[in-house]
Amino acid sequence: MSESRSRPTYTGDIASRGIDRAQEYSVETQEIAFTDDQHAIWEDLFAGVHRPLLLEHVCRSFLDGLARLELDPTRIPTVAYLNERIQRRTGWRIERTAVRYTQADDWYRKFAQRIFLITDYLRTRGQMEFTPEPDMFHDIFGHLPYLTQDFYARIEDRFAPAYLNATPEEKEVIKRLAWYSTEFGVVVEDGRFKVFGAGTISGRAELANTIMEFYRLSRDKVIDYHGAVYEQLQGHFLARQADIRRIIAGVDALHRQGQMSSQADGWNVVQVLYRDLGIARDGLLGGGVILAPFDVEVIAKLPKTVYAFNPMFFVCESFEQMENLLDSYLKPIARRGA
Protein backbone atom coordinates (compact mmCIF):
# COMPACT_ATOMS: atom_id res chain seq x y z
CA MET A 1 0.00 0.00 0.00
CA SER A 2 1.29 3.46 -0.79
CA GLU A 3 0.40 7.03 -0.04
CA SER A 4 1.75 10.45 -0.87
CA ARG A 5 4.86 11.41 1.05
CA SER A 6 2.94 13.93 3.14
CA ARG A 7 0.85 11.21 4.78
CA PRO A 8 1.73 8.38 7.17
CA THR A 9 2.56 5.00 5.72
CA TYR A 10 0.12 2.32 6.83
CA THR A 11 1.91 -0.99 6.93
CA GLY A 12 -0.71 -3.38 8.28
CA ASP A 13 1.80 -4.59 10.88
CA ILE A 14 0.59 -5.70 14.29
CA ALA A 15 0.96 -2.98 16.93
CA SER A 16 3.53 -4.85 18.98
CA ARG A 17 5.98 -4.53 16.10
CA GLY A 18 6.69 -0.96 17.03
CA ILE A 19 4.11 1.24 15.32
CA ASP A 20 4.35 4.83 16.49
CA ARG A 21 1.28 5.37 18.69
CA ALA A 22 0.86 8.81 17.14
CA GLN A 23 0.29 7.14 13.76
CA GLU A 24 -1.70 4.16 15.01
CA TYR A 25 -5.03 5.76 14.14
CA SER A 26 -5.86 8.14 11.33
CA VAL A 27 -8.46 10.74 10.54
CA GLU A 28 -10.84 10.59 7.62
CA THR A 29 -8.63 12.74 5.40
CA GLN A 30 -5.76 10.25 5.56
CA GLU A 31 -6.57 8.00 2.65
CA ILE A 32 -4.66 5.13 1.10
CA ALA A 33 -3.85 4.98 -2.62
CA PHE A 34 -4.52 1.30 -3.25
CA THR A 35 -2.88 -0.57 -6.09
CA ASP A 36 -4.77 -2.16 -8.97
CA ASP A 37 -3.92 -5.58 -7.50
CA GLN A 38 -5.49 -4.62 -4.17
CA HIS A 39 -8.65 -3.36 -5.86
CA ALA A 40 -8.74 -6.64 -7.80
CA ILE A 41 -8.62 -8.64 -4.55
CA TRP A 42 -11.50 -6.52 -3.21
CA GLU A 43 -13.47 -7.14 -6.42
CA ASP A 44 -13.00 -10.90 -6.20
CA LEU A 45 -13.88 -10.99 -2.50
CA PHE A 46 -17.02 -8.95 -3.16
CA ALA A 47 -18.07 -11.18 -6.06
CA GLY A 48 -17.36 -14.31 -4.03
CA VAL A 49 -19.86 -13.37 -1.31
CA HIS A 50 -22.32 -11.24 -3.27
CA ARG A 51 -24.16 -14.21 -4.74
CA PRO A 52 -27.93 -14.82 -4.53
CA LEU A 53 -27.47 -18.41 -3.31
CA LEU A 54 -25.45 -17.11 -0.34
CA LEU A 55 -27.22 -13.81 0.35
CA GLU A 56 -30.64 -15.46 0.60
CA HIS A 57 -29.38 -16.90 3.89
CA VAL A 58 -28.23 -13.52 5.24
CA CYS A 59 -30.58 -11.36 7.32
CA ARG A 60 -32.56 -8.52 5.70
CA SER A 61 -30.88 -5.87 7.82
CA PHE A 62 -27.53 -6.63 6.21
CA LEU A 63 -29.00 -6.48 2.72
CA ASP A 64 -30.79 -3.20 3.50
CA GLY A 65 -27.57 -1.72 4.87
CA LEU A 66 -25.57 -2.90 1.89
CA ALA A 67 -28.01 -1.07 -0.39
CA ARG A 68 -27.66 2.09 1.71
CA LEU A 69 -23.88 1.92 1.74
CA GLU A 70 -23.68 1.59 -2.07
CA LEU A 71 -20.25 -0.01 -2.11
CA ASP A 72 -18.44 -0.18 -5.44
CA PRO A 73 -17.90 -3.90 -6.15
CA THR A 74 -14.66 -3.11 -7.99
CA ARG A 75 -12.98 -0.46 -5.81
CA ILE A 76 -12.04 -0.19 -2.13
CA PRO A 77 -13.94 2.80 -0.73
CA THR A 78 -12.33 5.81 0.90
CA VAL A 79 -12.91 6.62 4.55
CA ALA A 80 -14.55 9.89 3.50
CA TYR A 81 -17.02 7.99 1.30
CA LEU A 82 -17.94 5.66 4.17
CA ASN A 83 -18.37 8.48 6.67
CA GLU A 84 -20.63 10.40 4.30
CA ARG A 85 -23.02 7.43 4.19
CA ILE A 86 -22.83 6.37 7.83
CA GLN A 87 -22.36 9.42 10.03
CA ARG A 88 -25.48 11.27 8.89
CA ARG A 89 -27.60 8.19 9.54
CA THR A 90 -26.44 6.90 12.93
CA GLY A 91 -23.80 9.32 14.23
CA TRP A 92 -21.02 6.73 14.06
CA ARG A 93 -17.87 7.58 12.14
CA ILE A 94 -15.04 5.56 10.66
CA GLU A 95 -11.31 5.79 11.35
CA ARG A 96 -8.52 3.78 9.82
CA THR A 97 -5.99 1.97 12.00
CA ALA A 98 -2.55 0.58 11.23
CA VAL A 99 -3.21 -2.25 13.70
CA ARG A 100 -4.36 -5.57 12.32
CA TYR A 101 -5.96 -6.77 15.54
CA THR A 102 -6.78 -3.88 17.86
CA GLN A 103 -6.52 -4.51 21.60
CA ALA A 104 -9.94 -4.61 23.23
CA ASP A 105 -9.29 -1.69 25.59
CA ASP A 106 -8.37 0.56 22.66
CA TRP A 107 -11.29 -0.76 20.62
CA TYR A 108 -13.89 0.04 23.26
CA ARG A 109 -12.43 3.45 24.04
CA LYS A 110 -13.06 4.25 20.39
CA PHE A 111 -16.54 2.71 20.63
CA ALA A 112 -17.32 5.05 23.51
CA GLN A 113 -16.72 7.90 21.04
CA ARG A 114 -18.89 6.14 18.42
CA ILE A 115 -15.83 5.49 16.27
CA PHE A 116 -15.57 2.23 14.34
CA LEU A 117 -12.04 1.24 13.35
CA ILE A 118 -11.19 -0.31 10.00
CA THR A 119 -7.76 -1.80 9.49
CA ASP A 120 -5.48 -0.93 6.59
CA TYR A 121 -4.69 -4.65 6.18
CA LEU A 122 -6.11 -6.49 3.15
CA ARG A 123 -5.95 -10.28 2.95
CA THR A 124 -3.79 -11.91 0.29
CA ARG A 125 -4.79 -14.10 -2.64
CA GLY A 126 -4.01 -17.11 -0.49
CA GLN A 127 -6.61 -16.01 2.10
CA MET A 128 -9.62 -15.45 -0.14
CA GLU A 129 -11.74 -18.12 1.57
CA PHE A 130 -10.71 -17.41 5.16
CA THR A 131 -8.45 -14.97 6.98
CA PRO A 132 -7.61 -15.49 10.66
CA GLU A 133 -7.33 -11.75 11.27
CA PRO A 134 -9.98 -9.17 10.41
CA ASP A 135 -9.03 -7.27 7.27
CA MET A 136 -10.56 -4.23 5.63
CA PHE A 137 -12.98 -6.35 3.57
CA HIS A 138 -14.32 -7.86 6.79
CA ASP A 139 -14.53 -4.46 8.48
CA ILE A 140 -16.16 -2.66 5.56
CA PHE A 141 -18.30 -5.30 3.86
CA GLY A 142 -19.17 -7.24 7.02
CA HIS A 143 -19.84 -4.52 9.59
CA LEU A 144 -20.48 -1.19 7.94
CA PRO A 145 -23.76 -2.00 6.17
CA TYR A 146 -25.21 -2.47 9.66
CA LEU A 147 -23.83 0.84 10.93
CA THR A 148 -26.17 2.66 8.54
CA GLN A 149 -29.04 1.45 10.77
CA ASP A 150 -30.16 2.58 14.20
CA PHE A 151 -30.84 -0.89 15.63
CA TYR A 152 -27.24 -1.96 15.07
CA ALA A 153 -25.87 1.32 16.35
CA ARG A 154 -27.89 0.70 19.52
CA ILE A 155 -26.41 -2.79 19.87
CA GLU A 156 -22.86 -1.50 19.45
CA ASP A 157 -23.56 1.40 21.84
CA ARG A 158 -24.19 -1.14 24.62
CA PHE A 159 -20.71 -2.60 24.74
CA ALA A 160 -18.32 0.26 25.54
CA PRO A 161 -20.00 1.62 28.73
CA ALA A 162 -20.03 -1.88 30.21
CA TYR A 163 -16.55 -2.89 29.05
CA LEU A 164 -14.90 0.28 30.34
CA ASN A 165 -16.53 -0.26 33.76
CA ALA A 166 -15.93 -4.02 33.97
CA THR A 167 -13.60 -6.24 35.96
CA PRO A 168 -11.03 -8.27 33.97
CA GLU A 169 -13.25 -11.35 34.23
CA GLU A 170 -16.30 -9.40 33.03
CA LYS A 171 -14.31 -7.94 30.15
CA GLU A 172 -13.61 -11.43 28.87
CA VAL A 173 -17.33 -12.26 28.95
CA ILE A 174 -18.16 -9.00 27.14
CA LYS A 175 -15.67 -9.81 24.40
CA ARG A 176 -17.28 -13.22 24.00
CA LEU A 177 -20.77 -11.72 23.86
CA ALA A 178 -19.67 -9.35 21.10
CA TRP A 179 -17.96 -12.20 19.27
CA TYR A 180 -20.96 -14.51 19.29
CA SER A 181 -23.47 -11.77 18.43
CA THR A 182 -22.17 -9.07 16.09
CA GLU A 183 -19.36 -11.20 14.65
CA PHE A 184 -20.91 -14.67 14.41
CA GLY A 185 -24.55 -14.41 15.46
CA VAL A 186 -27.55 -16.01 13.77
CA VAL A 187 -31.12 -14.69 13.87
CA VAL A 188 -34.47 -16.28 13.00
CA GLU A 189 -36.22 -14.45 10.18
CA ASP A 190 -39.23 -15.55 8.14
CA GLY A 191 -39.11 -18.93 9.85
CA ARG A 192 -35.51 -19.62 8.80
CA PHE A 193 -32.06 -19.29 10.30
CA LYS A 194 -30.33 -16.25 8.81
CA VAL A 195 -26.70 -15.23 9.19
CA PHE A 196 -26.25 -11.96 11.08
CA GLY A 197 -22.60 -11.89 12.16
CA ALA A 198 -20.12 -9.83 10.15
CA GLY A 199 -17.38 -12.41 10.59
CA THR A 200 -19.47 -15.09 8.92
CA ILE A 201 -20.76 -12.83 6.16
CA SER A 202 -17.30 -11.62 5.13
CA GLY A 203 -15.71 -15.09 5.05
CA ARG A 204 -16.83 -17.08 2.02
CA ALA A 205 -15.83 -20.49 3.38
CA GLU A 206 -17.38 -20.00 6.81
CA LEU A 207 -20.53 -18.52 5.29
CA ALA A 208 -20.97 -21.46 2.92
CA ASN A 209 -20.32 -24.03 5.64
CA THR A 210 -22.77 -22.34 8.02
CA ILE A 211 -25.43 -22.36 5.34
CA MET A 212 -24.77 -26.06 4.75
CA GLU A 213 -25.53 -26.66 8.43
CA PHE A 214 -28.89 -24.90 7.99
CA TYR A 215 -29.65 -27.36 5.18
CA ARG A 216 -28.37 -30.36 7.15
CA LEU A 217 -30.70 -29.64 10.04
CA SER A 218 -33.63 -29.88 7.63
CA ARG A 219 -32.27 -32.88 5.71
CA ASP A 220 -31.71 -34.85 8.91
CA LYS A 221 -35.18 -33.88 10.15
CA VAL A 222 -33.79 -32.04 13.16
CA ILE A 223 -35.56 -28.77 12.30
CA ASP A 224 -38.87 -28.52 10.45
CA TYR A 225 -38.79 -25.12 8.77
CA HIS A 226 -42.57 -25.17 8.53
CA GLY A 227 -42.74 -24.99 12.32
CA ALA A 228 -41.42 -22.72 15.06
CA VAL A 229 -37.69 -23.14 14.45
CA TYR A 230 -36.43 -21.34 17.56
CA GLU A 231 -38.55 -23.44 19.89
CA GLN A 232 -37.38 -26.59 18.11
CA LEU A 233 -33.76 -25.49 18.53
CA GLN A 234 -34.33 -24.87 22.24
CA GLY A 235 -35.80 -28.33 22.66
CA HIS A 236 -32.90 -30.07 20.93
CA PHE A 237 -30.39 -27.99 22.89
CA LEU A 238 -31.95 -28.90 26.22
CA ALA A 239 -32.08 -32.58 25.26
CA ARG A 240 -28.34 -32.59 24.48
CA GLN A 241 -27.27 -30.07 27.13
CA ALA A 242 -25.02 -32.48 29.01
CA ASP A 243 -23.11 -33.37 25.83
CA ILE A 244 -22.89 -29.71 24.82
CA ARG A 245 -21.41 -28.78 28.21
CA ARG A 246 -18.72 -31.42 27.68
CA ILE A 247 -18.02 -30.10 24.18
CA ILE A 248 -17.70 -26.51 25.44
CA ALA A 249 -15.31 -27.66 28.16
CA GLY A 250 -13.34 -29.52 25.49
CA VAL A 251 -13.16 -26.45 23.23
CA ASP A 252 -11.97 -24.38 26.18
CA ALA A 253 -9.28 -26.95 27.01
CA LEU A 254 -8.05 -27.02 23.40
CA HIS A 255 -8.02 -23.23 23.34
CA ARG A 256 -5.92 -23.09 26.52
CA GLN A 257 -3.51 -25.63 25.03
CA GLY A 258 -3.11 -23.55 21.87
CA GLN A 259 -4.63 -26.24 19.67
CA MET A 260 -7.15 -24.04 17.86
CA SER A 261 -4.71 -21.96 15.85
CA SER A 262 -5.43 -23.17 12.33
CA GLN A 263 -8.33 -23.14 9.92
CA ALA A 264 -8.58 -26.94 9.75
CA ASP A 265 -8.43 -27.40 13.52
CA GLY A 266 -11.15 -24.83 14.04
CA TRP A 267 -13.59 -26.40 11.65
CA ASN A 268 -12.97 -30.01 12.68
CA VAL A 269 -12.63 -29.48 16.41
CA VAL A 270 -16.24 -30.42 17.18
CA GLN A 271 -15.94 -33.69 15.28
CA VAL A 272 -12.66 -34.46 17.07
CA LEU A 273 -14.32 -33.85 20.43
CA TYR A 274 -17.26 -36.10 19.55
CA ARG A 275 -14.78 -38.89 18.95
CA ASP A 276 -12.59 -38.21 21.98
CA LEU A 277 -15.54 -37.74 24.34
CA GLY A 278 -17.64 -40.60 22.94
CA ILE A 279 -20.52 -38.32 21.94
CA ALA A 280 -22.95 -39.60 19.30
CA ARG A 281 -22.93 -37.56 16.10
CA ASP A 282 -26.61 -37.29 15.40
CA GLY A 283 -29.49 -34.84 15.58
CA LEU A 284 -28.41 -31.35 16.65
CA LEU A 285 -24.85 -32.63 17.04
CA GLY A 286 -24.68 -34.30 13.64
CA GLY A 287 -22.84 -31.56 11.75
CA GLY A 288 -19.51 -29.80 11.77
CA VAL A 289 -20.79 -26.96 13.93
CA ILE A 290 -23.46 -26.58 16.60
CA LEU A 291 -26.35 -24.12 16.54
CA ALA A 292 -27.51 -23.12 20.02
CA PRO A 293 -29.98 -20.64 21.52
CA PHE A 294 -28.26 -17.39 22.51
CA ASP A 295 -27.49 -17.74 26.22
CA VAL A 296 -25.18 -15.43 28.17
CA GLU A 297 -24.12 -18.11 30.65
CA VAL A 298 -23.23 -20.57 27.89
CA ILE A 299 -21.34 -17.97 25.85
CA ALA A 300 -19.37 -16.92 28.94
CA LYS A 301 -17.83 -20.40 29.02
CA LEU A 302 -16.90 -20.59 25.32
CA PRO A 303 -13.66 -18.90 24.21
CA LYS A 304 -13.37 -16.80 21.09
CA THR A 305 -11.83 -18.75 18.23
CA VAL A 306 -9.99 -15.89 16.54
CA TYR A 307 -7.61 -18.00 14.49
CA ALA A 308 -10.02 -20.78 13.57
CA PHE A 309 -13.52 -21.42 12.31
CA ASN A 310 -16.15 -21.19 15.03
CA PRO A 311 -17.44 -24.46 16.50
CA MET A 312 -20.73 -22.93 17.70
CA PHE A 313 -23.16 -20.30 16.45
CA PHE A 314 -25.70 -18.74 18.79
CA VAL A 315 -29.20 -17.99 17.56
CA CYS A 316 -31.59 -15.22 18.60
CA GLU A 317 -35.30 -15.37 17.91
CA SER A 318 -35.24 -11.67 16.97
CA PHE A 319 -33.02 -8.61 17.22
CA GLU A 320 -35.22 -7.39 20.07
CA GLN A 321 -34.39 -10.58 21.98
CA MET A 322 -30.70 -10.04 21.23
CA GLU A 323 -30.84 -6.51 22.63
CA ASN A 324 -32.66 -7.70 25.76
CA LEU A 325 -30.23 -10.56 26.41
CA LEU A 326 -27.22 -8.30 25.95
CA ASP A 327 -28.81 -5.72 28.27
CA SER A 328 -29.30 -8.36 30.97
CA TYR A 329 -25.53 -8.63 31.32
CA LEU A 330 -24.19 -5.29 30.10
CA LYS A 331 -26.49 -2.73 31.71
CA PRO A 332 -25.83 -3.63 35.37
CA ILE A 333 -22.07 -3.39 34.75
CA ALA A 334 -22.36 -0.09 32.90
CA ARG A 335 -24.46 1.42 35.71
CA ARG A 336 -22.32 0.14 38.56
CA GLY A 337 -20.96 2.96 40.67
CA ALA A 338 -23.10 5.57 38.94
Could you tell me what each predicted segment is?
Residues 126-327:
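A contiguous, surface-oriented mixed alpha/beta subdomain in the mid-to-C-terminal portion of proteins
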Residues 1-147, 151, 265-286, 291-338:
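The feature captures two recurrent sequence modes
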